[in-house]
């Protein structure tokens, strides 16, 4: 044993002697910026962080804090915030820390990108610099937008402020006690970054077949087809492109031109409409609407056969599919969470009666209109087909099973799917169907997993953005020089859904010259088309709509002459008026006296 210890000690001493400075700082595990110049993989990790930290929720989360849904998970932070727990120190919608950290990485990358040797070939190296710089600008814009959306707002002294804008890498000597830039300044800086990205990036990543197809600027520096395809070819699909940056610019403009911000943003609805039109014109405008775009999540032939980085006609930008078991990947987490109990799910997201009532009749009339033909005794008959596609209601047929949410007395129909039967039952009388794949099985004895994709931007969202902004700028039938109007877009989207197709959409025709009624319809179409995609929380706020609409449900019981439908209050929301704008984090307010808090927080 003594000999063994001596040998070990000798070996250790030899090791220490050979590596006498191994314990000096910044040697083994801490690499300096200079090392990035000759190690492109190391340098690209900074940009990779920007992608890894993209602020997109991979499932419906914030909808349960709106009038569209509740959850039976009573520990949900989003549910708690809707019930009164939202504060500057308890904020599920907070973006400050993650976005600021990501921007630091991106600023560092932008400061060194043109010093890194990305390729030994001069022309290919320059193409890499252009592409990577463009991606970094777009990602920085995206992160600043999410900061602005979550934390921009009006202060007690009447200023519309955004967030502190930082464009250089920060170090220990940097000035961190920065005031907030104005909201208008923030929007302009975001636009500047997006314009730089648009100038540097290709419309799409695609291979070329000859040097003659090279962009002129790359022909002039002697680039070759092979180098171009390496940098801008199909292998790069899924990364940010010019098309994606243009779509994002339209989203930013729509927020800034909305009622909650327009008085201080400097952005007009005309600008927002034209930015959206730029994106839509690239797919032929109205003719580019995907006939199956409203059911993108259940178009299994497209989802299962989509190649690496490819998109469908509806999806403008998406995340990657993998073979993991996590949400939205090759798995069934979404289905396990949201299938009804009889399908081995936890029934988490429960659509509200409020949302159900927003779906019109198939003839296009709202259910409150005397011409609708709606019957309170048969409320799901002859409704907008999207109601059946997005929501499971009482006696819906799904996966070969009839889903009974009513409180029937007979044993045959009395299941755990009924209202409030067990902890995983619906609280509203409805279950989620949208986003879920019907061909998945959560049955432990026959699990069946399928591909899912995190969808970041849909073309339908851009069409709706155009309709909203165009109606505000030019009225329902004006087009501002474009080839289609808000009316044209809404008519096409409703026709795709099967709404108003048998009567020429008589309701739409009756309001097409009324700007205010068209505004209501456009907002309602957006609510329906984008439900459960984490849009409603922000839409309510940017439109300055009331925050405290009570979440309602339905109790269905068997009466002597049929079913009896009784509306019920499920959650009484507890927002304050100042909560149209989110807070600056309390911890930041304690640290920096140059920060000004939004009014009320």
Residue spans of the language-model regions?
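Membrane-proximal, proline-rich intrinsically disordered regions
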Residues: 19-65, 116, 359-381, 586-601
